[in-house]
Amino acid sequence: MKIIFTPSIKLFSCVHISALIFFFIFGYEGYLHYLFITLGYIAQTYFEFASHYYLFHGPFWKFHQKHHVEPSNDTHLLVPFAYSIPLGITIHTGYYYFLPLKTTFSFMTGHGLSYLFFEYIHYISHKRPKHFVYILKIPFVKALLLAHKKHHYKNGKMLKDKNDNFKNYGFTTLYWDKIYDTYE
């Protein structure tokens, strides 16, 4: 599949899938493992929403605006490694500091899976690769892609100014936007 061979996705996938395998092997066994995977997944969906809403449409707008001006540009499409690697290390260290080791491993499995899903959904929403046509037909994915399209466009007009009325900050879920009343 072509998407796997783009440089960013390939490196991201190798690094994070290796970590996910490690976390999965050394995490809890049984139902606690799946509970903490689920909680890690949910935590990442909130982090994704909150960082987009509070940071990228706030103090980091000038950096993020490049993506709104050229949404399909590979340079601005995925979270840059200069941001994601230090942030990932900080998050992993924070979980390790506050949670028992096995909990951290399980939690980070869910967190990592959610982050991979986020990167792929965001890539698919802007690139629409032909080999992913079957994914584009799944109702849940269609709803996510429509919501993200509304984040970038309103009435056919591209939203690229900080004062534009942005909505739909989540990528992999709609529920945080519904809770914060930013869903359209």
Regions of interest found by a model, annotated:
Residues 1-12, 65-79, 98-104, 111-184:
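Cytosolic/stromal cytosol-facing helical appendages immediately following the last transmembrane segment
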Residues 1-31:
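Metal-centered catalytic cores of metalloenzymes
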Residues 11-23, 77-96, 170-171:
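Core segments of transmembrane alpha-helices
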Residues 19-37, 93-106:
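Helix-coil boundary and interhelical linker segments in multi-pass alpha-helical membrane proteins
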Residues 23-30, 48-55, 78-88, 105-114, ...:
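Phosphate-binding glycine-rich loops and adjacent basic patches that engage nucleotide phosphates
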Residues 36-39, 61:
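Short amphipathic alpha-helical segments
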Residues 39-56, 109-128:
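Transmembrane alpha-helical segments that form the membrane-embedded catalytic/substrate-channel core
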Residues 49-70:
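Membrane-helix interface/capping segments
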